[in-house]
Amino acid sequence: MIITKSWLNDWLELEEISSDKIAKTLNSIGIEVDRVGALKAPDKVVVGYVKEKIKHENSDKLSICQVDIGSETLQIVCGAANVDAGQFVAVATKGAIMSNGMEIKEAKLRGVDSCGMLCSSLELGFEKINEGIMLLDESIGKLELGRPLNTYEIFNDELIEVELTPNRGDCLSIYGIARDLAAALNLNLKEPKPFKESENVLGIGRILRLAAEKELNGLYNYRAIGLKEEIQTNLLLSLRLAQIEGLGKNSIENLLNYATHSTGVLFNAYDLSSFSEKDEEFTINLSKQVHGETKVSYKDKLLSFSGIFQNNESRCKDDSKIIIIEANYTDPLVIADAKIYHKDQDEKMLYRSFRGSEPKLNLGMDFLLGIFEQIPNLVIYSSSQQILTDKELPIIPISIEGISDIIGQNVDKDEVLKILKKLGFELILSGEGLINVKAPLHRPDIKNLSDICEEVVRIIGIDNIASKGLEFIEKNRLNSAYKNYIEFLNLRKRAVASGYFESLHYVLDNGEELKRLGFDSVKLKLINPITAELNTLRTTLLNHLLNAASLNAKNSKKIIKLFELGAVFNVNNQELNRIAFIHSGLKEEAKISNKAKPESVQFYDFLLDIKNIIGDFKLKSSKYNILSPYEQADIYLSDIKVGFIGRLHLKIENERDLPKTYICELDLDLIRQDFKIAKPYSKFPAITRDLSVLIPKGFEYNQIKNCIEELNLEILENFRLVDIYSDENLKEFYSITISFSFRDINKTLEDNQVNECMDKILNTLKNLGLDLR
């Protein structure tokens, strides 16, 4: 789509606005500018008048012209066949540099002095409009002899070529582009004045009648023109049409092409004399076809299919005397469906109608008649014949809040309404903050709130919308049952990965066995138990696991690692979720690394398994009758007791015929982790330090751990107990070794920083009464 600034000036006041700003504005409102170029005549090319023309004595094709340029009369030898006395022409004077780089100099042509050149449009750097030289007329402005040609707007213009998306058929005209620019630049759109009918002229009803079916998928407006002589296309229209490759040999077709490119309205011109007899009334039949398109015909002769093609036999000719001008609009969806069924197609017409031509037929017709009105020896028949169907436009309810939510920032209501009105939308204010919007007929692509938001953003400017991350808020569709399933499944997977087999048992248990293990019974007893061994609801998972382990041991299993996840009941018959583990027998299978003599499971081994399954935890001393008094502890997560762990009491091991056995039971509801704590990794190296400390026997390591943690040393990454040592020389003391790791997230640590932290740790240990070994 090609436009020029001067052409836009016909619709908008753009004298004070640069082409660069116009291009930037078009880009910002979604009309992509491909290129901007200057259209300027060379300097030292002026308006001249051919006073006299005589034939060159020594040439059949050359003429000697006396050309008045105001300040002087130049003798110019010209070879153009169309030059003649009485013409206004473009004269390149001495020193002018033409578009091809040629400099005009005084010269002799076949022995005759020539002091300049009469120019064609092509020689001036414009598109070719005719054979020979370019003849000037006052369509470009008042002709003044000697006036530089590039002081006329058409010869000092700027061309802008834009690329349009298929949905923007409304911008396939100067008027359509100007309409969007008016909204973006807050300018008033200049529309053509309504055509004023002349008095004492025949009405169109004398020569034309319409016969139309109801419910046509289009709009139609007809006018009649009487021609007394062949008309010519003026210079302004010729230059503009040549720029858009729309200049032809037929002047009527040229005027229609110009009006279409200017307004977007589609036109057809029918030669009345080609079909009807003299003094016969011309009846145009409009009929709706099977695919929705409209057939325009006269008797049995096809004139056109609206928006698809026009029959060549119906077109106007240079000698046409009466022509019927048809302005038409067809729903682009109808064109899209129907065009594939027509072998004959007008590609230029289809390009517009398929995307949506301008439906304001009166605007286009008034514009065209305004051009015809300036042509002498021409009669415009009064009145018009029209077929206007009321198409019900869809109503789109919108709210300013809804628009603001989609755009991502608050927008002013008055600004939104102003933009939509400028773009031709019909607005109906309703209650509760809603606005009912009807998209104009020239915007069939506007169908919902999002489309309207896009229009608002286009005009406001995407660069004026604050950047904001798109936030997706999805409703949580996971219920508690599914969450429990996933959490329990993950626990099972980790337990299996640690070598444990899952065991499943009834929720019923043996009340006597539970009592011997030290577990309370539920208050409510079973009235009719299945068996004597299953006579109560279980209060722990461990009894079943011990029985299962005992059975496995009796079947010569050397490594017994079992777990069970399920429900238990407290003394008040409330259901609780628990998970229990048991590791009985050997630590591992016999293999080369242990010389086929694997050790029995140790407390530390069992603790590592539980850590791998539930994560880090703390231990505190405990007292359970079911456990060995020397190897047992309560398990804490975030200072909350979640269960216990330890070695099964030797007495119970013997009663159940079990080898060395460790057990653990945890409250599932307390070990859940509803969130993950993520920390960045440091790319800098760690520095380690070890301390060996003497502690009295019976002194809890947790006291040391808690005191060090309370120091809140920023660079202390972690610390752990790595060794416990005792011998006769230490008597009532143990020697423990603690390893400390220091690291900074932002830089490499220096020794003095680490030493400072170690001094604080040593002072803390001294406050506990502990000394270095």
UniProtKB/Swiss-Prot annotation:
State its cofactor: Mg(2+)
Instruction: Cite the FDX-ACB domain residue spans from the record.
Output: 682-773
- Compartment list: Cytoplasm
Q: Catalysed reaction per UniProt?
A: tRNA(Phe) + L-phenylalanine + ATP = L-phenylalanyl-tRNA(Phe) + AMP + diphosphate + H(+)
- Occurrences of domain B5 (ranges): 391-467
Q: What is its EC number?
A: 6.1.1.20
Q: Domain of life, per the record? A: Bacteria
Record field: transmembrane: none
Q: Which InterPro entries match?
A: aa-tRNA-synth_II/BPL/LPL (IPR045864), B3/B4_tRNA-bd (IPR005146), DNA-bd_dom_put_sf (IPR009061), Fdx_antiC-bd (IPR005121), Fdx_antiC-bd_sf (IPR036690), NA-bd_OB-fold (IPR012340), Phe-tRNA-ligase_IIc_bsu (IPR045060), Phe-tRNA-ligase_IIc_bsu_bact (IPR004532)
What does the entry give for GO biological process? phenylalanyl-tRNA aminoacylation
Disulfide pattern: none
Q: Which SMART domains match?
A: B3_4 (SM00873), B5 (SM00874), FDX-ACB (SM00896)
Cofactor: record remark: Binds 2 magnesium ions per tetramer.
Ranges of residues in domain tRNA-binding: 39-150
- Fetch the Pfam families from UniProt: B3_4, B5, FDX-ACB, tRNA_bind, tRNA_synthFbeta
Q: Does the keyword Protein transport apply?
A: no
Predominant place of localization: cytoplasm
Keywords assigned: Aminoacyl-tRNA synthetase, ATP-binding, Cytoplasm, Ligase, Magnesium, Metal-binding, Nucleotide-binding, Protein biosynthesis, RNA-binding, tRNA-binding
List the SUPFAM superfamilies hit by this protein, alphabetically: Anticodon-binding domain of PheRS, Class II aaRS and biotin synthetases, Nucleic acid-binding proteins, PheT/TilS domain, Putative DNA-binding domain
Q: Does the keyword ATP-binding apply?
A: yes
Residues the entry annotates as binding Mg(2+): 445, 451, 454-455
Q: Which GO terms describe its molecular function?
A: ATP binding; magnesium ion binding; phenylalanine-tRNA ligase activity; tRNA binding
Self-association state and partner proteins as the record states: Tetramer of two alpha and two beta subunits.
Against PANTHER family, the record matches this protein to: PHENYLALANINE--TRNA LIGASE BETA SUBUNIT, PHENYLALANYL-TRNA SYNTHETASE BETA CHAIN AND LEUCINE-RICH REPEAT-CONTAINING PROTEIN 47
**Similarity comment: family membership:** Belongs to the phenylalanyl-tRNA synthetase beta subunit family. Type 1 subfamily.
Protein's name in the database: Phenylalanine--tRNA ligase beta subunit
Per the UniProt entry, what species is this protein from, by scientific name? Campylobacter jejuni subsp. jejuni serotype O:2 (strain ATCC 700819 / NCTC 11168)
Upper lineage: Bacteria, Pseudomonadati, Campylobacterota, Epsilonproteobacteria, Campylobacterales
Report which gene this protein is encoded by: pheT
